[in-house]
């Protein structure tokens, strides 16, 4: 088949590459992602998006591949950094209180909820091992070979939970020699050190690679003690707001810092001339970072301004136990900050993660055994950790066996374990509205088998296989929102221990085929059948850990011991036609489907709210082109898509029973207090992606991208929702663009080279909720990053000066609102110097 690569590698070399592929220009977005051998053009980028090795320009789908070299050139160190230059990709850390988790969306489709009852909407893979949770997924990008971002549903190629697309990260494999040591020093306390070393264990047979990294940065939001800074406040004088700061600067800590280290080891067994290659990897990460940066934008005093009639006004809500009003004196910056406020700082918060004595039992809990206390009686202080850390480790093994020149077998086995601790004080004040201390323990095992074949004189490429996945997640939390406004006056009622377990099993069989009808026309198709089952066990305990927690709406209706079950079988399809107009120009048309698994109610308050919801499903129609023009000085790739989104998972305003009727108030039907997810409605998503790389002269390179996502709900299945037909999805912007330019100036044979690079990226604004409340709208922003790198003549030494957010732009990544509004500010300008020694 024209322009395809071999199924396997023998002794690290590609065994079959067509001449047109070798001529296929330069790597998308600038640098080579793979340069495994001198026999391969160093500018060819090889990807495995279609489960076989291909030049990225031959893959008939919307894909961006980025090399590890380009990640370094752009000063991108974590997975969330790549969002700036990726068309139609939103990848950010979640707001404070959601741990070390990320929100990932491709083409407006994805997931941000970290609950184990909800599945990711974009699949993330590390060396082909599926990672089944958004927690702990802000991966470090040290020693990365390449990243592939596949846009659109990948149900047949990648499988479960690739509704919006897939992100695939590939680490560098051992080659037998070489390595580096690198150190970075910058403002905001940045100290980074990383190193990697390659060894030959057995000549021409066994190789090893070890990599380590540590990253340290100060937080960019400072937490202050309100009582310390405001000693004349009448609530401070009365003692209702105690001062807890121990230092004279009134600081309690930071938010948004980074403290982590990670190690990875890999072993490659590839005897020269042998049909067998085995790659074994193990990694460990310890992240002790504090919670994500967040600030109070508006309190209950101001958040209701301009809201529609009927909106619940909590502006006068107070804290009965403390007798403190929750008002704008706790706002430190912006239009709702009071003129006489002590602080005028966009990077400041009064969150103290402390409740001096408001730990309560549930309404109606009887005195004496088993709890031993009276409802409403304070039990002692509650201190939540200012944490968003994670501890994770994993092992994997990939076995490639070449059965013949035309037949190969691959086995991919992986096990991962992750523990994440998070705490929140999301009201950003010393009063007690919303606090929690949550732990997540996630374990998963996966096994995939693939059989690749090249048949009919290389005209037919065939991949068949199976996939198995087993995961268990324990969610243990202390939820503390005692005066959230849902209870009778002066009655604390919403404080309990959550100890849930979610178990998921999934297995699938798949087949993908590509047939070269002619030297230029190729037809491809695929099918995958997936069966999955999730069981979710609920446990709710009183704050002292004794006795079932009795829900606020029905004291005789506990949740403990109830199990919710979701089970579904889903079939995905793919059909593609691609045509090579010339050796350097290809057009294609594709139809594909994908799904995001269903689940059960993530946060029910009574057992009647336990109800399964089905999978989200997507049908996508895409046409595109890939070209290398002007003697390969210009690369231009583009795609246009239309997607039909079925079964959007969302929360109704009033919970429904299994008969689709609103639950009674005494049975979980409290308006505004629903912990269900339902398949609320359908939507359509349209847009495009366009990417280019231009090399007008030796050493000069320009790259750019632009994209558009138009998301619109087309039908609503249930009336008890805030969503209306025609609404956009919150958190999703429309038009996005980026551009970068660099020039490598050769200073002389014995001097080296100097490479300046500038990147500019524009992120669109979006509505923060379905109402497009102006209080939670996120404005668009444009960021500029710069880097200047000197390399020695033999490139064994390099030194770089970099500036991220060069013009110190203040912006919000996201905002969140209930009866107050908080936001996550982006990091201010950061400057650093990096020195690297290669050997």
Predicted regions, residues:
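N-terminal Sec signal peptide and the immediately downstream disordered periplasmic leader
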Residues: 1-74, 79-84, 278, 395, ...
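Acidic, small-polar-rich N-terminal luminal/periplasmic segments of exported/outer-membrane proteins
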Residues: 41-176, 623
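Outer-membrane beta-barrel translocator/receptor signature
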Residues: 121, 133, 142-151, 156-237, ...
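Outer-membrane beta-barrel domain signature, strongest for Gram-negative TonB-dependent receptors
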Residues: 247-252, 258-462, 635
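Structural signature of Gram-negative outer-membrane beta-barrels, strongest in the C-terminal barrel
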Residues: 268-270, 451-452, 461, 467-469, ...
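Outer membrane beta-barrel strand-and-loop segments of large Gram-negative receptors
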Residues: 440-448, 496, 502, 506, ...
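Gram-negative outer-membrane beta-barrel transporters
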Residues: 523, 639-644, 671-770, 836-838
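C-terminal beta-signal and adjacent terminal beta-strands/loops
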Residues: 644, 651, 761-769, 789-839
């Amino acid at each position: 088949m024209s322009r395809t690569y071999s199924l396997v590698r023998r002794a690290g070399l590609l065994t079959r590459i067509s001449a047109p592929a070798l001529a296929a220009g330069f790597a998308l977005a600038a640098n080579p992602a793979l340069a495994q051998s001198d026999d391969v053009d160093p500018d060819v980028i090889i990807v495995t998006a279609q489960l076989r090795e291909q030049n990225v320009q031959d893959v008939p789908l919307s894909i961006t591949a980025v090399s590890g070299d380009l990640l370094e050139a752009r000063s991108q160190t974590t997975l969330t950094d790549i969002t700036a230059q990726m068309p139609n990709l939103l990848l950010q850390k979640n707001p404070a209180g959601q741990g070390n988790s990320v929100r990932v969306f491709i083409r407006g489709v994805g997931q941000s909820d970290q609950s184990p009852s909800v599945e990711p909407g974009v699949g993330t893979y590390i060396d082909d091992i599926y990672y089944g949770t958004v927690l702990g997924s802000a991966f470090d990008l040290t020693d990365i070979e390449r990243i592939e971002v596949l846009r659109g549903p990948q149900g047949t190629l990648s499988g479960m939970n690739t509704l919006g697309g897939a992100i695939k990260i590939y680490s560098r494999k051992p080659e037998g020699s070489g390595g580096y040591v690198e150190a970075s020093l910058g403002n905001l306390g940045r100290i980074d050190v990383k190193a990697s070393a390659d060894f030959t264990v057995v000549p021409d047979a066994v190789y090893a690679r070890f990599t380590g990294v540590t990253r340290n940065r100060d937080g960019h939001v400072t937490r202050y003690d309100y009582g310390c800074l405001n000693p004349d406040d009448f609530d401070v004088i009365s003692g209702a707001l105690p001062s807890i700061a121990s230092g004279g600067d009134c600081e309690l800590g930071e938010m948004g810092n980074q403290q982590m280290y990670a190690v990875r080891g890999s072993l490659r067994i590839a005897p020269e001339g042998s049909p067998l290659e085995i790659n074994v990897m193990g990694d460990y990460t310890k992240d002790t970072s504090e919670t994500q940066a967040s600030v109070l934008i508006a309190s209950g005093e101001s958040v209701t301004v301009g809201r529609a009639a009927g909106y619940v006004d909590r502006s006068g809500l107070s804290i009965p136990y403390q007798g403190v009003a929750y008002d704008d004196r706790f706002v430190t910056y912006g239009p709702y900050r009071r003129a006489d406020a002590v602080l005028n700082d966009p990077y400041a918060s009064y969150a103290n993660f402390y409740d001096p004595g408001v730990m309560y039992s549930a309404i109606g809990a009887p005195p004496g055994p088993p709890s031993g206390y009276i409802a409403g009686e304070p039990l002692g202080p509650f201190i939540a950790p200012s944490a968003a850390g994670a501890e994770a480790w994993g092992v994997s093994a990939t076995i490639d066996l070449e059965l013949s020149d035309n037949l190969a077998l691959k086995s991919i086995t992986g096990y991962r374990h992750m523990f994440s601790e998070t705490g929140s004080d999301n009201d950003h004040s010393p009063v007690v509205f919303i606090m929690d201390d949550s732990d997540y323990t996630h374990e998963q095992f996966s096994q995939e088998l693939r059989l690749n074949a090249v048949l009919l004189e290389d005209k037919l490429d065939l991949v068949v296989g199976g996939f198995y996945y087993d995961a268990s997640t324990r969610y243990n939390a202390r939820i503390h929102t005692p005066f959230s406004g849902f209870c009778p006056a002066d009655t604390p009622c919403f404080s309990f221990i959550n100890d849930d377990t979610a178990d998921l099993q999934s297995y699938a069989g798949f087949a993908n085929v590509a047939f070269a009808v002619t030297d230029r026309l190729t037809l491809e198709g695929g099918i995958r059948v997936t069966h999955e089952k999730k069981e979710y066990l609920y446990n709710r305990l009183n704050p002292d850990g004794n006795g079932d927690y009795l829900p606020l709406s029905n004291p005789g209706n506990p949740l403990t011991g109830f199990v919710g079950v979701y089970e579904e079988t889903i079939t995905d399809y793919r059909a593609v036609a691609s045509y090579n107009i010339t050796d350097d120009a290809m057009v294609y048309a594709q139809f594909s489907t994908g799904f995001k698994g269903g689940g059960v109610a993530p946060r029910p308050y009574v057992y009647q709210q336990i109800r399964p919801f089905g999978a989200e499903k997507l049908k996508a129609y895409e046409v595109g082109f890939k070209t290398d023009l002007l003697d390969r000085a210009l690369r231009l790739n583009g795609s246009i898509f239309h997607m039909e989104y079925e079964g959007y998972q969302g929360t109704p305003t009033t919970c429904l029973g299994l008969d689709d009727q609103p639950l009674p108030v005494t049975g979980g039907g409290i308006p505004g207090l629903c912990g269900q997810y339902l398949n609320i409605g359908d939507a359509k998503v349209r847009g495009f992606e366009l990417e280019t790389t231009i090399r007008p002269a030796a050493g000069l390179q320009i790259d750019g991208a632009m994209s558009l996502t138009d998301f619109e709900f087309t039908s609503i299945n249930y009336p008890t929702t805030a969503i209306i037909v025609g609404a956009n999805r919150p958190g999703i912007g429309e038009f996005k663009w980026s551009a970068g330019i660099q020039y490598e100036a050769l200073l002389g044979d014995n001097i080296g080279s100097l490479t300046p690079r500038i990147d500019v990226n524009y992120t669109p604004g979006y509505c923060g909720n379905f109402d497009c409340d102006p209080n939670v709208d996120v404005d668009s922003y444009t960021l500029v990053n710069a880097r200047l790198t000197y390399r020695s003549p033999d490139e064994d030494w390099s030194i770089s000066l970099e500036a991220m957010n060069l013009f110190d732009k203040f912006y919000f990544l996201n905002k969140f609102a209930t009866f107050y509004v908080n936001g996550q500010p982006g990091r201010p300008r950061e400057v650093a110097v990096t020195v690297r020694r290669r050997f």
